[in-house]
Amino acid sequence: MPQNEYIEQHIKQHGRRLDHEERKRKKEAREGHRVAKDAQTLKGWRAKQFAKKRYSEKVSMRKKIKAHQESKVKGPSTPKQDEGEALPTYLLDRQTNNTAKALSSSIKQKRLEKADKFSVPLPKVRGISEEEMFKVIKTGKSKTKSWKRMITKHTFVGEGFTRRPVKMERIIRPAALRQKKANVTHPELGVTVFLPILGVKKNPQSPMYTQLGVLTKGTIIEVNVSELGLVTAGGKVVWGKYAQITNEPDRDGCVNAVLLV
């Protein structure tokens, strides 16, 4: 046996630890945490190398998944009549039912229907800078610390919302700028109803603003439409529906929205 294979030799002679499999399983389970920590903490050249390695891993994984999905797709449903005769390229797809093509066309059709279903009244809105969105709050004994921010726009918080302790609250959402209801207009019925807001679905400015519940022009919100008496095709009452804010709530002092139907 070569000299550099002493570990394999020792395993063959004495075997492994009794808890080897358990230790190996736990190490593999911790691998995700280690990768996440490296992604957050690495700096400089090591971070670049790590990002490059992760990018190549993700690309290879995507290729494997795509190849696996393509292998599942069936080929022509009926075999060719004469196997021995070679057909030219322009005759290969004639009189054959390819499931992959049907699947691709159905996916495209569904995407078009989805885009048409959720077309919004305001497709584009003005961008808002962080200086306009947040106000710096000075804290500390001598007012030298400036890690706190106060949102200057109207926000929505849920029913069970509780503020964090003052010394740990980084972003302040003032109680005076919180909204619970919106003036929602139904485009087909032509009526405007004062409906309670259920949540913020999407803020076009940033995902962080969506998480904070900031209400700006163009934001998609979910409202309670049970008062309108809308019913589905199956006869069930519609509870929540999406609406888009069409005004500037911080200027008008109220939220006006159009229901997406």
UniProtKB/Swiss-Prot annotation:
Nuclear localization signal 1, short sequence motif: residues: 15-22
Lineage: Eukaryota, Fungi, Dikarya, Ascomycota, Saccharomycotina
Top-level taxon of the source organism: Eukaryota
Annotated function: Involved in the biogenesis of the 60S ribosomal subunit. May play a part in the quality control of pre-60S particles.
Motif (Nuclear localization signal 2): 51-58
Positions with biased composition (Basic and acidic residues): 7-37
Organism of provenance: Lodderomyces elongisporus (strain ATCC 11503 / CBS 2605 / JCM 1781 / NBRC 1676 / NRRL YB-4239) (Yeast)
Subunit comment: Component of the pre-66S ribosomal particle. Interacts with NOP7 and RRP1. Interacts with RSA4 (via WD repeats).
Region (Disordered) location: 1-38, 56-84
Any one Gene Ontology cellular component term annotated for this protein: preribosome, large subunit precursor
Protein name: Ribosome biogenesis protein NSA2
Family affiliation: Belongs to the eukaryotic ribosomal protein eS8 family. Ribosome biogenesis protein NSA2 subfamily.
Example of a GO biological process term: maturation of 5.8S rRNA from tricistronic rRNA transcript (SSU-rRNA, 5.8S rRNA, LSU-rRNA)
Chief place of localization: nucleus
UniProt gene name: NSA2
Cellular location(s): Nucleus, Nucleolus
Record-linked Pfam families: Ribosomal_S8e (PF01201)
Keyword field contains Nucleus: yes
InterPro entries: NSA2_fam, Ribosomal_Se8/biogenesis_NSA2
